[in-house]
């Protein structure tokens, strides 16, 4: 089965690579329209997936990731339309010039070819990834989690109908609908057909892909994100940022998981934090230095376990640790962070600059929420993933991250001397 999918995707990629920006945008507009026109089919399929997942004991955080609503589905369709409005990087000349030999040389952006994406209970990923791949002239093979099998099947069917109505092969966007995990291992060895693999899931999936894949892998999306509260912070303003970073949508990878508080501001900051977190329904996991003071406040508090500093809660839980200074905060982030998104809240711009320079994450913020690490927020449109590695792509992966380049030399029957 996968062999035939690979062949179909590779053949489709050749056709997609030749499309003009106008032709690709026409396809995307058709997909967005069909997602709305056939929303009832997709939402009914999703309702069945959610019901099964709840019956199987899936956590509330994961159920939130899985669930589609009419508003969310409309937002997904609107994201596709936003991709239409983005500049097409394919065909862009990055640089070039004329050599001493007279050869005119240029470096031009081209599609990667076929992208493979493995993801879990995130039905929006199906459309986000498909739209970005189509905009950049790439075919895609999707493997969603078993929790989203009906939703993904319905969504991909809509996309394939739109492709065919525009005269393009259905092989441009395909999904593996068999939940057999053995197919993941088979997919990881499809280097004959797949040019880049992107896993979007937990640490176990990333480890599996790194160890078994014969395809170049882009890893990321695991977000143990930190906010350091410096001693010069404006407490009321800082609390607004922390509430946003923790509670806006707790199940996302750019949600803050650990709060590092400078010891010199702890006495005034912790009571205010407790009040705010109680109002927001957040459970605080406090270290020994913060525990007694937080227990005197209204928020629910438990003693932090050492391993929780490495956890991506994806829920209304927040670690709180008292640190001696900026050096201590940076050391903690280096030990426990996942190089996703980290922030400092401070009025001291020297400390802010040090934090930016010394914290080696894909996104670093000064006096801003970690929730901004998102393709849409960055103006990239929908994102295919958030990469926390350094080669090829880093941070939210938009259109350019789905391209490579080729060297083109144009001569006049020019030969090398």
Swiss-Prot record:
InterPro entries: Ald_DH/histidinol_DH (IPR016161), Ald_DH_C (IPR016163), Ald_DH_N (IPR016162), Aldehyde_DH_dom (IPR015590), G-glutamylP_reductase_CS (IPR020593), Glu-5-SA_DH (IPR012134), GPR_dom (IPR000965). Optimum pH is 7.0. GO terms for cellular component: cytosol. One of its GO terms (biological process) is proline biosynthetic process. Its main location: cytoplasm. It is found in: Cytoplasm. Keywords: Amino-acid biosynthesis, Cytoplasm, NADP, Oxidoreductase, Proline biosynthesis. SUPFAM superfamilies: ALDH-like. Pathway: Amino-acid biosynthesis; L-proline biosynthesis; L-glutamate 5-semialdehyde from L-glutamate: step 2/2. NCBIfam families: PRK00197.1 (NF001221), proA (TIGR00407). HAMAP family: ProA. Belongs to the gamma-glutamyl phosphate reductase family. PANTHER family: DELTA-1-PYRROLINE-5-CARBOXYLATE SYNTHASE, GLUTAMATE SEMIALDEHYDE DEHYDROGENASE. Catalyzes the NADPH-dependent reduction of L-glutamate 5-phosphate into L-glutamate 5-semialdehyde and phosphate. The product spontaneously undergoes cyclization to form 1-pyrroline-5-carboxylate. This is Gamma-glutamyl phosphate reductase.
